[in-house]
Regions:
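A glycine- and Lys/Arg-enriched "phosphate-lid" helix/loop adjacent to the NTP-binding pocket
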Residues: 97-160
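Phosphate-binding P-loop
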Residues: 1-2
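ATP-dependent small-molecule kinase phosphotransfer cores
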Residues: 36-116
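Post-Walker A helix-loop "phosphate-sensing" segment adjacent to the P-loop in P-loop NTPases
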Residues: 24-34
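ATP-binding Walker
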Residues: 12-13
Length: 160
């Protein structure tokens, strides 16, 4: 059974809070949960790139995102999914990455439709199709309010 639940949404949309609340409830039901923050969090490559987010051109950005995501999937997500009674709660996966990049392409009037890339990676067992994707979409005013209160970070600053 694929116990892989992904939470997608922009910064400050409530993904982490929702994931933590769900994790508590799942543990009450007798299952183990693993919270995984995803791209640009755990690998040296991802941490290095996170510091330079917004300073690289889009093809390089896409390459870094997917390389880091592939490493994260192989080294963190897949091993946990082999454990019995374990549910991986993923804070962003490939939907957020492809959507951000597509939206940026639309903004600069360039075709950055890369949705076929994660699809090919899933079909070739490089990335994993989530058993459930949860899209956190609060009203825009709430996002703005939360973003104003959020700490400075290359990721948040990129989307401000």
């Amino acid at each position: 059974m694929n116990n892989f639940i992904v939470f997608e949404g922009i910064c400050c949309s409530g993904k982490t809070t929702t994931t933590k609340l769900l994790s508590e409830r799942i543990k009450e039901l007798g299952y183990e949960t693993v919270y995984n923050h995803g791209a640009m969090t755990y690998t040296d490559l991802g941490k290095k790139f996170k510091k330079n987010l917004g300073k690289k051109d889009m093809p390089i950005t896409v390459s870094y995102f997917f390389t880091d995501l592939i490493i994260n999937t192989k080294n963190i997500i897949k091993p946990y999914l082999t454990k019995k009674n374990t549910i991986v709660l993923q804070d962003r996966y490939f939907d957020a990455i492809t959507t951000y990049i597509k939206a940026y392409g639309d903004y600069i009037k360039t075709d950055y439709n890369i949705y076929d890339i994660p699809k090919a990676f899933v079909e070739n067992d490089i990335l994993i199709e989530p058993s459930l994707s949860v899209f956190c979409i609060p009203p825009f005013e709430i996002i703005k309010e939360r973003m104003a209160k959020s700490k400075e970070s290359p990721v948040h600053d990129f989307y401000r």
